[in-house]
Amino acid sequence: MSNLSRKQQTQKRHRRLRRHLKGTAQRPRLAVFRSNNHIYAQVIDDEAQNTLCAASTLDKDLRTSLKADGSSCDASNAVGDLVAKRALAKGIQQVVFDRGGNLYHGRVKSLADAAREAGLQF
């Protein structure tokens, strides 16, 4: 049995993942952060250390169109679609998916599926 809390387990998984994930200019990293109320996605170039584009449930574009709060799978679908459109507008077609220590399930999975359907490759 693990004596770590759920948050500590997530942080441990995130550190383990980040050892191997690197975003480049040709293939930046799509980083996902999930809180209790919202979900955030950023496309990051780790070599230049800058964010190329981002989307979240707090965006003005999405706040008006979302019926429920930002903690649903529908909201995650909208964020995945929006971040993919913004990335494709900047000429980014391939990314490395960084789930941020979260399990690939639920809101994180729906964001990834929506980004794939919108045209991002990972």
Curated annotation (Swiss-Prot):
It comes from the Bacteria. InterPro entries: Ribosomal_uL18_bac-type, Ribosomal_uL18_bac/euk. Keywords: Ribonucleoprotein, Ribosomal protein, RNA-binding, rRNA-binding. One of its GO terms (cellular component) is cytosolic large ribosomal subunit. Residues 1-26 are annotated as: Disordered. One of its GO terms (molecular function) is 5S rRNA binding. Belongs to the universal ribosomal protein uL18 family. NCBIfam families: L18_bact. PANTHER family: 39S RIBOSOMAL PROTEIN L18, MITOCHONDRIAL (PTHR12899), LARGE RIBOSOMAL SUBUNIT PROTEIN UL18M (PTHR12899:SF3). This is Large ribosomal subunit protein uL18. It comes from Prochlorococcus marinus (strain MIT 9313).
